[in-house]
Amino acid sequence: MFLEKDYLKLKIKQFLPEFLSIYTPSGEEYKAKDFFEKIASELDLSLQVTSTNSYLLGDGDILLVGHVDTVPGFINPKEEGEIIYGRGAVDDKGPLISMIIAASILNKNGYSVTVGALSDEENKSKGAREILRIGKKYDYIIVGEPTNTFGVVVEYRGVIHLDILCRARSEHSSSATSNLIFEIAKKIINTTRINTGYDDVSIVPTIFKSGEYLNVTPSNAVVHFDIRYSVRNSKDQIMSEIHREFEGCEIHEVEDISPVKVDVNSDIVKVFMRSIIKENYKPTILRKRGTSDMNILKDLALKGILAYGPGNSSLEHTDHEKISLDEIFIATKVYINAIEALWPKM
């Protein structure tokens, strides 16, 4: 009964609109506590609320992990037929509901799994870092991000966030012999790399601050760079080039998350590909240009990690987030089939 389409769709319609009605931007995941207590009780899953306001449902050696937080900007949930709209429908509440329903069915069938509904993924990944600090290892970790329902993500790029502070002597603008803004602008132009290929380093300035007075050249300037790089790039080389260009400036590394890449011939990837085929769809291998909790959690996976989930990834972070019952139904079946196939390999 549990795998019948009507039953699964009924559960999705029961849980997802309510979840979407709870506005949980990063830092406000605590608002979902009552919801998780309710869903855990109804689906007979144990529940642990952590210090970062993440929620752990069930207890097993396979971890299904998604995130509770969304980007800012509430969207009133609505339903049109079998389409559900709302902030987080795609990223990441739709995939998370799919995982929780799959986990409840798997646990009833004797396959013990844990669902991690983590906090702060859209910010500094406090939830994932907390799981990393706890240190429990899992045989397999599946990260529930929207992968267009038929995609399997085997690679995410890493990220480096840099704040660079440069100083100079300020002068009256009418008789200035130099200008820090002009000098730093040249360095920014020399450093920036946009519209690059996947395996090329992307270096994008996102914040620039300088100057205090209308008639005085600035004494300091701050630029923030968002740097993305793949496993084929060297962080040391990237940083060496930055230090050379901004010699004499203070360079502060705000965040560094290393890239992650999974062997396409690994058991977990092949099993998920077969599970999608089993549902009569053609799977695709994906490489994501951004970064996710998969980068942070990779060292906790003893045998394999990947990302898979329902939802059109092009709708992430937009005001048009929507997901269909069919997408979540298919993903739920894929999660169940894949974990049942992985179980003998543990």
UniProtKB/Swiss-Prot annotation:
Protein name: [LysW]-lysine/[LysW]-ornithine hydrolase
Active site: 69, 121
Molecular function terms, GO-annotated: cobalt ion binding; hydrolase activity, acting on carbon-nitrogen (but not peptide) bonds, in linear amides; zinc ion binding
SS bond partners: none
Residues at which Zn(2+) 2 binds: 91, 122, 317
The organism of origin for this protein: Sulfolobus acidocaldarius (strain ATCC 33909 / DSM 639 / JCM 8929 / NBRC 15157 / NCIMB 11770)
Phylogenetic placement of the source organism: Archaea, Thermoproteota, Thermoprotei, Sulfolobales, Sulfolobaceae
Binding site for Zn(2+) 1: 67, 91, 145
Cofactor: Zn(2+); Co(2+)
SUPFAM superfamilies reported in the protein's UniProt record: Bacterial exopeptidase dimerisation domain, Zn-dependent exopeptidases
Any Gene Ontology biological process: lysine biosynthetic process via aminoadipic acid
Cofactor note: Binds 2 Zn(2+) or Co(2+) ions per subunit.
PROSITE patterns on file: ARGE_DAPE_CPG2_1, ARGE_DAPE_CPG2_2
Free-text function comment from the UniProt entry: Catalyzes the release of L-lysine from [LysW]-gamma-L-lysine and the release of L-ornithine from [LysW]-L-ornithine.
Location in or out of the cell: Cytoplasm
Substrates-to-products reaction catalysed: [amino-group carrier protein]-C-terminal-gamma-(L-lysyl)-L-glutamate + H2O = [amino-group carrier protein]-C-terminal-L-glutamate + L-lysine; [amino-group carrier protein]-C-terminal-gamma-(L-ornithyl)-L-glutamate + H2O = [amino-group carrier protein]-C-terminal-L-glutamate + L-ornithine
Record EC number: 3.5.1.130, 3.5.1.132
Primary residence: cytoplasm
Family: Belongs to the peptidase M20A family. LysK subfamily.
Pathway(s) where this gene product acts: Amino-acid biosynthesis; L-lysine biosynthesis via AAA pathway; L-lysine from L-alpha-aminoadipate (Thermus route): step 5/5; Amino-acid biosynthesis; L-arginine biosynthesis
Superkingdom of the organism of origin: Archaea
Assigned keywords, A-Z: Amino-acid biosynthesis, Arginine biosynthesis, Cobalt, Cytoplasm, Hydrolase, Lysine biosynthesis, Metal-binding, Zinc
Enzyme class, first EC level, given as a word: hydrolase
One cellular-component annotation, GO: cytoplasm
